[in-house]
Amino acid sequence: YDTAYGLCQIIGQNNRFGPAQIASLTAEVKTIVERREICPHIFPSILKALKSSTSANVRMLGNRLEPLLQHDVFERRQNGSSSLPISPHIHIFDVSSYPDTIRTTLAELLLYDWFRSARALQIPIVIMVDEVQNLRLGRGTVLNRIITEGRKFSIGSILISQSLKGFAPDEQLALSQTGTKLFFKPPLTEIRACSEMLAEPVRRSGTVELLKKLKVGQCLLLSDFTYIGDSLQPSSDCIQ
């Protein structure tokens, strides 16, 4: 039930479903999750169940979710995960080719599956997310849980963003909890937001000047584990 509910919460939030709709969707998804040994293609199985339901409301959910569920992304694997091949290799999942209307939902579902699988299997992994500004990081989201809880389960994360302007205050709070922050030269419109994340108020004006003076390829690094140069001047030393 927890797996079905977690998946349906993400789908429901991204599609603005109400509690009753999420409950109906969860009931259908729970059946598929319980039968995933014989229904390995999870999304098509969910879509078929929704569209063949005796309930008109459930069939309506199937029609609304067909653009998402017609993509056979999740597949039952021998190691217990649905989409993540747990192995000592790098695996790249590119969702840019999917329609804009389902891209965020699909990315969050993948993150949820990886987080759940890695936590259950107790295998350390690192999840790198590019263009993270396109995803939700607020309280209760899967990416927020990866940031705030991941280290307890040996799950690391590397988050890459072109901008901080799109993040809400609670999302910036989540980002501030990351162990290491690395800022390359930002545009002038981003300098204040970067300085607020890098420095306490009493040191913020100095940080603004440092950010303005950065050259291409230089960056400011804030970390509990690495110290390069001094606190007043940027360093051109390579990060090993």
What are these regions (language model features)?
Residues 164-165:
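Conserved beta-strand edge residues that scaffold enzyme active sites
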Residues 1-155, 159, 168-171, 202-203, ...:
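P-loop NTPase motor domains
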Residues 20, 170-240:
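P-loop NTPase motor core of the ASCE superfamily
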Residues 156-161, 181-185:
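Short hydrophobic alpha-helical runs that function as membrane-insertion/retention elements
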